[in-house]
């Protein structure tokens, strides 16, 4: 494992997750529109949720944006095996166009029993519209037992808990091959200035491109651009500005936000980027692992979950393997080591006892541990791509590199949740994506994109 990373992971500083609203962002996915598998894997220990209940073979449907095969298998196996103990059937379907389809399902009066929300801003919209139900006291007690207040906060709307944390992501990471760096004489950058200088040097050397980038993701195309912008706002303008931007106290067209957007597109030039789809906007976000492993680019900035999207057989953090992939912290500007986080939250569309039994189980450390075991198995024993900050987990279910991710999450002095996921859905999962994509395509300027996004903010 990278020594710099270990040193960073060990820094004992206090957690400071700040709530600007209620939000998340993850679209870890593979090819295809919707995918469902039947559960039947590791059920973990004795299930707490449901107790000795018998739900008579009822079926609980769950939808969400996670549609890569390992995630689908792990979710269904984890929930399916537990559900057998209470005579339930649970079916999870991963949807490439979850953002659009969940709206259609709700408007048509046929929502799933539960859905996984990658944008708690959207969850807040649904809660205020009366589409999802508040958690009952017994489920709230389970959430309190296993989740710190900082994580619960993003599923809380107007002092009522609707969402349960189901997955945690650390986004401020850069994937790379240490052996490729060593062969070319490059060193891991520790400041953002060093990072940009390294990108310039790589481009000038004329070998593999510095970066692999792709932002295509179906209806969610553009979300990877928003992640880069959020990381840059945190680094260039600081946490206070970030919080005010997310809550619209500082508008999108403020020069500090425009600067962050411009910084990203200045890095994403033809000289700097390998885009396997021919252009950044046409390259699926999940298609950047293969070219990095194949030596077509040196770096890919993406969250911890991307471990599950590298080609089968990829090794991680192994100094004996010249093809091994590792990560380094996306460098900061001012030495304050901010991190961008995200997550997925489960919310229910009805309060049936069977639905709430599933929600209760999702809130437990047992669910997190069991999903991690199942997902590790589904990827063939490598990094799973899954992470959970649930308290009370056995850390041994995570590999060393994954444990360092959790250490970073729980020790970051400045940690901020994904800004676009905290914003109203029309902005964070709407114009920020679409205008960002137009900016990346060169159709508009950063100033024009920012002005249009700001104009879309609900009054």
Segments (PLM) and residue ranges:
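Extracytoplasmic/periplasmic substrate-recognition and gating elements
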Residues: 80, 184, 313-381
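C-terminal capping/gating helix-and-loop segments adjacent to ligand/active sites or protein-protein/ligand interfaces
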Residues: 381, 399-457
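Glycine-centered hinge/linker elements that transmit conformational signals in sensory
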Residues: 199, 246-278
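Conserved N-terminal structural module of periplasmic/extracytoplasmic solute-binding proteins
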Residues: 23-124, 129, 141-143, 334, ...
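Short, solvent-exposed loop/beta-turn-alpha elements that line the ligand-binding surface or hinge
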Residues: 136-149, 215, 219, 223, ...
């Amino acid at each position: 494992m990278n020594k710099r990373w270990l040193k960073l992971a060990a820094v004992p500083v206090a957690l400071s997750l700040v709530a600007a609203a209620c939000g998340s962002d993850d679209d870890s996915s593979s090819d295809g529109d919707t995918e469902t598998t039947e559960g039947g894997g590791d059920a973990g220990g004795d299930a707490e949720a449901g107790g000795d209940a018998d739900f008579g073979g009822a079926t609980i449907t769950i939808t969400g944006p996670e549609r890569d095969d390992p995630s689908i298998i792990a979710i269904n196996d984890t929930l399916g095996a537990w559900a057998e103990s209470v005579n339930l059937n649970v079916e999870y379907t991963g949807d490439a166009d979850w953002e659009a389809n969940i709206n259609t399902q709700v408007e048509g009066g046929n929502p799933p029993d539960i859905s996984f929300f990658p944008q708690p801003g959207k969850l807040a919209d649904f809660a205020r519209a009366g589409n999802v139900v508040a958690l009952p006291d017994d489920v709230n007690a389970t959430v309190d037992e296993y989740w710190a207040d900082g994580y619960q906060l993003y599923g809380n709307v107007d002092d009522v808990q609707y969402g349960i944390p189901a997955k945690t992501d650390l986004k401020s990471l850069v994937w790379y091959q240490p052996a490729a760096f060593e062969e070319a004489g490059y060193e891991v950058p520790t400041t953002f200035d060093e990072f940009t200088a390294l990108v310039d040097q790589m481009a000038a050397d004329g070998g593999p491109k510095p970066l692999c980038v792709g932002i295509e993701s179906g209806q969610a195309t553009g979300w990877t651009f928003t992640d880069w912008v959020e990381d840059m706002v945190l680094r260039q303008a600081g946490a206070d500005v970030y919080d005010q931007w997310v809550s619209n106290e500082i508008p999108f067209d403020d020069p500090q936000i425009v600067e962050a957007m411009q910084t990203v597109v200045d890095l994403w030039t033809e000289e700097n980027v390998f885009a396997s789809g021919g252009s950044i906007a046409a390259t699926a976000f999940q298609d950047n692992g293969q070219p990095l492993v194949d030596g077509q680019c040196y770096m890919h900035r993406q969250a911890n979950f991307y471990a599950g999207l590298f080609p089968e057989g990829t090794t991680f953090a192994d100094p004996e393997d010249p093809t091994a992939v590792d990560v380094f912290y996306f460098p900061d500007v001012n030495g304050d080591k901010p991190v961008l986080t995200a997550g997925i939250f489960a919310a229910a569309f009805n309060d049936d006892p069977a639905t709430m039994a599933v929600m209760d189980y999702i809130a437990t450390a047992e669910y997190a541990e069991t999903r991690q075991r199942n997902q590790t198995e589904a990827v063939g024993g490598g990094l799973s791509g899954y992470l959970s900050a649930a308290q009370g987990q056995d850390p041994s279910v995570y590999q060393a590199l994954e444990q360092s991710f959790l250490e970073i999450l729980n020790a970051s002095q400045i940690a901020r949740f994904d800004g676009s996921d905290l914003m109203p859905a029309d902005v964070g999962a709407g114009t920020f994506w679409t205008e960002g994509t137009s900016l990346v395509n060169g159709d508009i300027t950063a100033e024009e994109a920012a002005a249009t996004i700001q104009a879309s903010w609900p009054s």
